[in-house]
Amino acid sequence: MTDWTSLAYAVVDVEGNGQQPPDLVELAVVPIVGGKIGEPRSWLVRPERSIKYYATRVHGLTNDDVASQPPFAAIADEVRTALAVPALVAHNAHVDTGALQREFGDWQCPEVFDTLKLARRLLPRRESYQLGVLVKDFNLAADLPDNLTPHRAAYDVRVTARLFVHLATATDAQVLSLEALRGERAGDSDEATTLF
């Protein structure tokens, strides 16, 4: 069994403009290396299309907030560097990875650990797996700066990183292996299905 901390992760969260498909207006990335949560990076992004009112109601960002920010193309190399790890972590990850794939185009997404799916598998029979509920139930926002608010990328990426570490270390009072996080059973491997 492989220790989950042997892999480097980038936790990512994105916020969109509410268009279909959405343009990014904010994203944040925080590394997890050796099981330790690192320093987050965040970017505001000027989208090609305006931010819809209902999106502003969710994350609080307005068109004025991003009017003087760079377009994604101007920060793409920085973001690509921050995401250059063996694995990504996100809550409801298909939203984040889908938005990044649309922005990058040629991006090869690494292995993804979805904390929504992990929580459903590792914490069965909960009433809710919404990020906000899990944050409250496990006190994952403790000691965060007061200027951070839910549904902003800088907040969500931090609490998602804490949730991932919590899930990897607190299930039944044992640290999970990388294989267990992946949902692999003991003895599962590519070699087991090889005939020759």
Identify the residue ranges that each predicted region occupies.
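Generic structural signal of hydrophobic/aromatic residues within well-ordered alpha-helices
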Residues: 55, 119, 177-181
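Conserved non-catalytic scaffold segment of RNase H-like nuclease domains
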Residues: 1-110, 117, 124-128, 132-140, ...
